[in-house]
Structures are given as structure tokens and as C-alpha cells.
Amino acid sequence: MIQVLLVIICLAVFPYQGSSIILESGNVNDYEIVYPKKVTVLPTGAMNSAHPCCDPVTCKPKRGEHCISGPCCRNCKFLNAGTICKKTMLDGLNDYCTGVTPDCPRNPNKGESDELEWSAAATGSVLM
């Protein structure tokens, strides 16, 4: 129970996770973090053990780690700039990681419409 509380607190400290809601997804060991228009599924057992990227005492990324979660965060590090984080039907309009944030910023060349976007993120772990 304390580990679950620490993970929830850690998620609430970071702006990217600030609006998160943690929901139990049926299986006691599976949880989901829900963002506006985004759903990230945590690995089985993630809520039952300390998050590998989060210092449970300070609720911040551990020393040497960049991030805890997000479409541009893998293994506690930001993905390289230019990594596709959201694919569209037209290659030139994909969304790319910046290399300095866990977020997936919208391609500035896109219009307001999302008609050309696929229904899931490029990584398959985040639905947008």
C-alpha cells in the first residue's frame, strides 16, 4: 500500500503526470495512467514495486535519470530527438520527440485537423 502511495505521489509531482488519474484495470497487478486524450498502460506489477526511475523518498527521477514516463521516455531516459512518437498517414507530418522532454509535441506543420493521424501512437504503448 505504501509503494502504491509513493508511486501516486511521484506521478503527481511532475507536470506531465500532474493531471493523471490511476485506475485499476481489472487485474490487481495492472493499472493505467489516464491523461487527456492519452492512456499509458503500466507494466504488470509496476504498482506493487518501486518505479525503477523514481526515488521513493524524494518522488523525483533518480540521480542520472531524466524522466519517469511519457511517450518520449524509455528506460528513464528521453528518447533521441527525431524519434517518431506519433505516426500519421503522411510521413512528413509525424510527431517527433525533442530529446529534452517526455512529451510528444504536435508537429507544427500540421493543421488543426487530426484526419491524417493514426489512432495509436507509433510505439504502441500510448494511445492518443
From Swiss-Prot:
GO molecular function: toxin activity
Domain spans labelled Disintegrin: 47-112
Residue ranges of the motif Cell attachment site: 89-91
Keyword 4Fe-4S in record: no
Keyword Kinase: no
Leader sequence residues: 1-20
Keywords: Cell adhesion impairing toxin, Disulfide bond, Secreted, Signal, Toxin
Disulfide bonds: C53-C76, C67-C73, C72-C97, C85-C104
Major place of residence: secreted
Propeptide: 21-47
Compartments (UniProt record): Secreted
Purpose: The heterodimer bitisgabonin-2 preferentially inhibits the adhesion of the alpha-4/beta-1 (ITGA4/ITGB1) and alpha-9/beta-1 (ITGA9/ITGB1) integrins to VCAM-1 and also acts as a strong antagonist of alpha-5/beta-1 (ITGA5/ITGB1).
Subunit structure: Heterodimer with bitisgabonin (bitisgabonin-2 is the name of the heterodimer); disulfide-linked.
PANTHER family: ADAM A DISINTEGRIN AND METALLOPROTEASE DOMAIN, ADAM METALLOPROTEASE
Entry's family note: Belongs to the disintegrin family. Dimeric disintegrin subfamily.
Name recorded for this polypeptide: Disintegrin gabonin-2
Biological source species: Bitis gabonica (Gaboon adder)
